[in-house]
């Protein structure tokens, strides 16, 4: 299943829905190391287009 808003995630595709993205407050190294962790947050119409291309479950 997918992760709801506020849940810990590793990538955008982990998050439920087209408009939710995986946000990392301190994403220093391009997504490889997350000192504070990442969580699903509400994005925008652009994340929806990106997820439609990249995620099999959208």
From Swiss-Prot:
It comes from Phoneutria reidyi. Belongs to the neurotoxin 09 (Tx3-6) family. Coiled coil: none annotated. Disulfide bonds join 2-16, 9-22, 13-48, 15-40, 18-55, 24-38. GO terms for molecular function: toxin activity. Keywords: Disulfide bond, Knottin, Neurotoxin, Secreted, Toxin. This is U7-ctenitoxin-Pr1a. Probable neurotoxin. Expressed by the venom gland.
């Amino acid at each position: 299943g997918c992760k709801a808003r506020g849940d810990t995630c590793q990538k955008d595709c982990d998050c439920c829905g087209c408009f939710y993205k995986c946000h990392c407050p301190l994403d220093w190294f391009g997504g490889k190391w997350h000192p504070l962790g990442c969580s699903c947050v509400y994005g925008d119409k652009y994340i929806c287009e990106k997820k439609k291309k990249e995620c099999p479950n959208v």
